[in-house]
UniProtKB/Swiss-Prot annotation:
This is RAS guanyl-releasing protein 2-B. It is a peripheral membrane protein. The lineage of its organism: Eukaryota, Metazoa, Chordata, Craniata, Vertebrata. It is found in: Cytoplasm, Cytosol; Cell membrane; Synapse, Synaptosome. Residues 377-403 are annotated as: Disordered. It comes from Xenopus laevis (African clawed frog). InterPro entries: C1-like_sf (IPR046349), EF-hand-dom_pair (IPR011992), EF_Hand_1_Ca_BS (IPR018247), EF_hand_dom (IPR002048), PE/DAG-bd (IPR002219), Ras-like_GEF (IPR008937), Ras-like_Gua-exchang_fac_N (IPR000651), Ras_GEF_dom_sf (IPR023578). Its main location: cytoplasm. Ca(2+) 1 binds at D431, D433, D435, H437, E442. It holds the Pfam family EF-hand_5. The keyword Zinc-finger applies.
């Protein structure tokens, strides 16, 4: 690659010509880095369909040598990025047109180089609801989370998150960088929801225990999980686990802290030190750079890099937007290439499909920050001396904030299939006597996996003292509907006195009178009568207070905002935080755009 050309930049046509000229008649590449970089990065500058049209036009006007090089270029494109041709039918058809045109002109040798029909299906990369592949022997005792080996739990968490990570394509990164959020990006949205789900599930598992000793034992177990994740070089799930353990609802549990051993504290501190954001995550970057074999990057850090590059450097080197800024292209390519290389290596673990089903549902047991904090207060109430302090809430999740304020909402049919399969797993694993029902004793084992499962009698609809598959399926479907499929963002209503006429979004009647109180959602601002609350079917769409570079308001709607880890506290397992009363803004809760 001529460095002088790169320094001054290249037009689209110039870089296409350079890529084509990199191939000899035998298909050998003289500059593979340039070709690989352009084929990955070209959608940033030109749609794939337009690139295919340019190649078609060049093949029509070129000589035999030129046509053969073009076909070698297309062949390399298909071999390196096959998913593009399966997931983009228009692009696939354009390449077929090129192949047919070559055949019609008698260029069968060149045409034979283009084999698009052998491209496998990549539809699974666009499926948001995930299913784990089979493997492993069913062991009932290992599926109780209280007794699950930390290494095994770390491996299954790795399997779940990496499966979701492997679906992310270049177009998803590109969309995220352009919008600054996951608008219209369900694959990345689901990945973020899973990341947040792990963090929140850890908080719920700790808070599900009633004594400080039990909670300390759960914390120790998850620190051991984090150790195993580090051994596996899974930095993404490691960040999620550390974020859950350092959440303010856990860090305020002083009685629990007193039962955590110095050894556990030392391990935890070392993990915090590794993941600190100091010097732009320098410690994590150094550690990740030395990794060989399977490695799972902390995606949030690398997305931050992409955002920073996009904001700092222009796409084009001229005002007319005809000359590509090759410097930016190379830097963005380096980040994305590192992520795509990590996707190629499968984790060296075998997954138990029944455990994956239970774990997936457990991770989707959505609770609001306020609900979790209130549960924390129930476990360890405030000391009297702290009750007079404080008007603003503790930071909701130091050191690692959630990436998103919204969970992905799955297709209803897929949700039903997922719940039915999960129920089958529950009965296969916990129906000890094989009578097709869950007894009260067996129900206690099931509840270990779902700390906030309702009472036995509420699931046992016919009150015969046992739960059938139909009753359990019905319960989960019912619960999913109430909680917006356990993954959606439900309304966060608060009483409000309206000083001007406001209409109810359910019955459309006015909420009138100075002393007439109604309800207003703190997230999306929707209003309704108290008696209409349970009948309201409108989805909560959290408002954005974001401003683009041009000062324009970002699009309001159902999308994600991404927040990165902040600096970790280093001295102790949990810093001495002053407890403060949870507080919400009167007019709404907003997300800040990067």
């Amino acid at each position: 690659m001529d460095s002088s050309d790169l320094d001054k930049g290249l037009t689209i046509d110039e870089i296409i010509a350079k890529c084509i000229q990199s191939f000899d008649k035998d298909g050998k590449l003289s500059d593979p880095k340039l070709v690989q970089m352009f084929l990955m990065m070209h959608p940033w500058y030109i749609p794939s369909g337009d690139l295919a049209k340019k190649l078609f036009a060049l093949s029509e006007s070129g000589d035999n040598v030129e046509r053969e090089r073009i076909c070698q270029f297309v062949r390399f494109w298909i071999s390196e990025f096959p998913a593009e041709f399966d997931l983009n039918p228009e692009l696939g058809e354009q390449i077929r047109d090129l192949k047919r045109a070559l055949e019609n002109k008698g260029n069968r040798r060149e045409s034979s180089l283009i084999d698009i029909e052998s491209v496998p299906s990549y539809g699974w990369k666009r499926q948001v609801t995930q299913r784990g592949p089979g493997g492993g022997r069913v062991r009932k005792t290992s599926l109780l989370f209280d007794h699950l080996d930390p290494a095994e739990l770390a491996e299954h968490l790795t399997h779940l998150e990496f499966h979701s990570f492997s679906k992310i394509l270049f177009q998803d990164y590109h969309s995220f960088v352009l919008h600054g959020c996951t608008v219209g990006n369900p694959v990345l949205e689901r990945f973020i929801a899973l990341f947040n789900g792990v963090s929140q599930w850890i908080q719920l598992m700790v808070l599900s225990k009633h004594t400080p000793q039990q909670r300390a034992a759960v914390i120790k177990q998850f620190v051991q999980v984090a150790e195993r994740l580090l051994q596996m070089q899974n930095f993404n799930t490691l960040m999620s686990v550390v974020g859950g353990l350092s959440h303010s609802s856990i860090s305020r549990l002083k009685d629990t802290q007193s039962h955590i051993s110095p050894e556990t504290t030392k391990v935890y501190d070392s993990l915090l030190e590794l993941l600190t954001s100091s010097d732009n995550y320098a410690r994590y970057r150094r550690r990740f750079a030395t990794c060989k074999g399977f490695r799972f990057p902390a995606l949030g850090v690398h997305l931050k890099d992409l955002m920073a590059l996009h904001v700092a450097l222009p796409d084009w080197a001229d005002k007319a937007k005809t000359i590509i800024n090759i410097s930016k292209m190379r830097q963005v390519y380096k980040v994305v290439h590192e992520l795509t290389e990590a996707q190629r290596l499968e984790p060296p673990v075998k997954a138990n499909p029944d455990l994956l089903n239970l774990l997936t549902v457990s991770l989707d047991q959505y609770r609001s920050e306020e609900e979790i904090y209130q549960l924390s207060l129930q476990r360890e109430p405030r000391a009297r001396s702290t009750q007079t302090h404080a008007k603003s809430p503790p930071s909701p999740s130091p050191p690692l904030e959630e990436w998103a304020s919204l969970k992905a909402k799955p297709d209803q049919a897929l949700l039903c299939q997922h719940i039915e399969k999960m129920v089958e797993s529950v009965f296969r694993l916990f129906d000890e006597d094989g009578d097709g029902h869950i007894s009260q004793e067996e129900f206690q084992s099931v509840r270990s996996n779902f700390p906030y499962l309702c009472a036995f009698n509420e699931i046992d609809q016919n009150q015969d003292g046992k739960i059938s598959k139909q009753e359990m399926t019905s319960y989960f479907l019912r619960a999913s509907s109430v909680l917006d499929c356990k993954m959606g963002f439900i309304h966060n209503f608060a009483e409000r006195t309206f000083l001007r006429p406001v209409s109810c979004q359910h019955c459309r009647n006015l909420i009138l009178g100075i002393y007439k109180k109604g309800l207003k959602c703190k997230a999306c601002g929707i209003t309704c009568h108290k008696h209409c609350r349970d009948h309201l079917s409108i989805e909560c769409k959290k408002r954005s207070k974001s401003v683009s570079e041009r000062g324009e308001s970002m699009e309001k709607g159902r999308h994600f905002f991404f927040t990165l880890p902040r600096s970790f506290r280093r001295s102790t397992l949990y810093p001495d935080l002053r407890e403060e009363e949870p507080h919400m803004e009167d007019d709404g809760v907003f997300d800040d755009h990067l």
